[in-house]
From Swiss-Prot:
Job description of the protein: Digests double-stranded RNA. Involved in the processing of primary rRNA transcript to yield the immediate precursors to the large and small rRNAs (23S and 16S). Processes some mRNAs, and tRNAs when they are encoded in the rRNA operon. Processes pre-crRNA and tracrRNA of type II CRISPR loci if present in the organism.
Family as reported in the entry's similarity comment: Belongs to the ribonuclease III family.
Pfam families: dsrm, Ribonucleas_3_3
Protein name: Ribonuclease 3
Reaction equations catalysed: Endonucleolytic cleavage to 5'-phosphomonoester
Ranges of residues in domain RNase III: 7-129
Active site: 46, 118
GO molecular function, one term: metal ion binding
C-alpha cells in the first residue's frame, strides 16, 4: 500500500505525533482501498468518543436530565458534526480511497469523513492511552462544548411530531422509496408525507434514520414559511 502523503502536516493539525504511524495510515484507509482498512479502528474510536463526550456533558451540566444529556451527546457525536471536524482538519486530502470512491467524490462524503475521525481517535488510543484521547477530543470539541445547551436538542422528527400534535394534525408518514449501494455504504431515500403539504418531502442519507431526520427537518422549514 502506498504511503499517505503529508502525514507530518496532518499530525500538526491533529495535535498529536504518532509513535506508530501505521495506526494513522490504517485510520485513513477506506475499505475500498485495502483489506487493512479503518472500520475496526472506527468501532474503537466511536466508543471512546461517546464516553469522553458523555463524561464532559455530565460534569458540565450537573442539573441536566438523562434525556437532555443524551440529546446533547447525540448532537455532538452525529455524523454531520464529525464530518465538520473532518473538513476543518482537511481530512479529505489524506484519505486513501479505491478508484471507484475517488471517482464518485468519496473524499467529500459525510459518512466517510465522519468514520475517518472516529478511526483516528481509535488509532490515537492504540498508539497512546485513553487520557491522551480524552485531552485531544476535548480540544477538538472545545468550541462546540462551549455553545451546546440542554434546550433545543430535540431531533427534527420529534419536533415535527410535537408540532403536528399541538395542532391536532395527523402524524407524518415516512416511507423508504429507494436504497442504493453495497450493504456497508448504502444510501437511503425517504419520503416524509404530511397532510398540510401538497407533496412528499424527500431526505437522502447514509441510513434510514438519518434520511428520515433530513426529510423531517425540511418539512419543518417549509412549515415556517
Amino acid at each position: 500500500m502506498e504511503p499517505i502523503k503529508n502525514i507530518p502536516r496532518l499530525c500538526r493539525t491533529l495535535g498529536y505525533e504518532f509513535t506508530e504511524q501505521a495506526f494513522l495510515d490504517q485510520a485513513l484507509t477506506h475499505r475500498s482501498a485495502s483489506n487493512k482498512h479503518n472500520e475496526r479502528l472506527e468501532f474503537l474510536g466511536d466508543s471512546i468518543l461517546s464516553i469522553v463526550i458523555s463524561d464532559a456533558l455530565y460534569h458540565q451540566f450537573p442539573t441536566a436530565t438523562e434525556g437532555d444529556l443524551s440529546r446533547m451527546r447525540a448532537t455532538l457525536v452525529c455524523g454531520k458534526m464529525l464530518a465538520e471536524i473532518a473538513i476543518e482538519f482537511k481530512l479529505g486530502d489524506y484519505l486513501k480511497l479505491g478508484p471507484g470512491e475517488l471517482k464518485s467524490g468519496g473524499f467529500r462524503r459525510e459518512s466517510i469523513l465522519a468514520d475517518a475521525v472516529e478511526a483516528i481517535i481509535g488509532a490515537i488510543y492504540l498508539d497512546s492511552e485513553i487520557e491522551k484521547c480524552r485531552s485531544l477530543v476535548l480540544k477538538w470539541y472545545e468550541s462546540r462544548l462551549k455553545v451546546i445547551e440542554p434546550i433545543n436538542q430535540k431531533d427534527p422528527k420529534t419536533l415535527l411530531q410535537e408540532h403536528l400534535q399541538k395542532f391536532r394534525k395527523p402524524l407524518p408518514v415516512y416511507k423508504v422509496v429507494h436504497t442504493e449501494g453495497d450493504a456497508h455504504e448504502q444510501t437511503f431515500t425517504v419520503e416524509c408525507i404530511v397532510e398540510d403539504l401538497s407533496q412528499a418531502v424527500v431526505g437522502v442519507a447514509s441510513s434510514r434514520r438519518k434520511a428520515e431526520q433530513s426529510a423531517a427537518a425540511q418539512v419543518l422549514e417549509l412549515m415556517k414559511k
